[in-house]
From Swiss-Prot:
EC number: 2.1.1.228
Keyword field contains Cytoplasm: yes
Catalytic activity: guanosine(37) in tRNA + S-adenosyl-L-methionine = N(1)-methylguanosine(37) in tRNA + S-adenosyl-L-homocysteine + H(+)
Compartmental location: Cytoplasm
Domain of life: Bacteria
Signal sequence coordinates: none
CC annotations in GO: cytosol
Keywords annotated in UniProt: Cytoplasm, Methyltransferase, S-adenosyl-L-methionine, Transferase, tRNA processing
Pfam families xref list: tRNA_m1G_MT
Alphabetical list of InterPro entries matching this protein: Alpha/beta_knot_MTases, tRNA_m1G_MeTrfase_C_sf, tRNA_m1G_MeTrfase_TrmD, tRNA_m1G_MTases_N, tRNA_MeTrfase_TRMD/TRM10
Main EC class the enzyme belongs to: transferase
Identification of the protein by name: tRNA (guanine-N(1)-)-methyltransferase
Length: 238
């Protein structure tokens, strides 16, 4: 997999060189390149934004600069991702789908966003997804890009040491799109708090049933909106 990130703040993406993403890069499982958008400017001030047509606060990132950058970086098989609070919600299912892509390009906007014509032009040549990581607004797309890239990379074959590690994650298909239940490790008693006895029993069937029930309880309490939870409760299974 190849990932290109275009931004006016390249250092913002440095965390991708750490931990799991960093190991994936070092091992050659993924090639991550960060590009400074200002490289495609042609004026002495390296301007990337201008005032919005129609008036209003803030500045809008200029189409000609973004157009040249994407022309150079993207090709027919590229999936262009534009982080924006006005986008579709990024989910675990999205991450799973993107984990099999050959080439992802993240266009990190700032200010009031990127001129809409950049998107309108790009969709004529490649697949484009405008995506949000939640119902809130960030100063730019870089933080969202890091979140999405980390979520995707841990699902890429070979990145996790144990391929089964993500199967029981919160929101995963194998967990029925529910939240993962609580986890415990040694010691069995700490500050008067005990590990649930069933987890010490060695009875795998009982442990699996306990974890399923704990997952349902947590989901019902914290995220009753999740479709997996609604389906199970609709069947009267909790």
């Amino acid at each position: 997999m190849k990932i290109d990130i275009v931004t006016i703040f390249p250092a913002y993406l440095d965390p991708l060189r750490q931990s799991l993403p960093g190991k994936a890069i070092e091992s050659g499982l993924v090639d991550v390149q960060v590009h400074d958008l200002r490289r495609w400017t042609h004026d002495v001030h390296h301007s990337v934004d201008d005032v919005p047509y129609g008036g209003g606060p803030g500045m809008v990132m200029k189409a000609p600069v973004w157009g040249e950058a994407l022309d150079e970086i993207c090709f027919d098989e590229t999936l262009l991702v534009i982080p924006t609070p006005a986008g579709a919600l990024f989910t675990q299912a999205t991450a799973q789908c993107w984990s099999t892509e050959r080439h992802l390009v993240f266009a990190c906007g700032r200010y009031e966003g990127i001129d809409q014509r950049v998107v309108d032009d790009a969709v004529r040549r490649m697949r484009v997804e405008e995506v949000s990581i939640g119902d809130y607004v960030l100063p730019g797309g870089e933080s969202a890009a890091v979140v999405m890239i980390e979520a995707v990379l841990r699902l890429v074959a070979g990145v996790l040491g144990n391929p089964a590690s993500h199967r029981d994650d919160s929101h995963s298909p194998d967990l029925g799109r529910l939240l993962e239940g609580p986890s415990y490790t040694r010691p069995p008693t700490w500050r008067g708090l005990d590990v649930p006895p069933v987890l010490l029993s060695g009875d795998h069937a009982r442990i699996a049933a306990w974890r399923r029930e704990a997952s349902l309880r947590r989901t019902r309490k914290r995220r009753p909106d999740l479709s997996g939870a609604r389906f199970v409760w609709g069947l009267g299974l909790s």
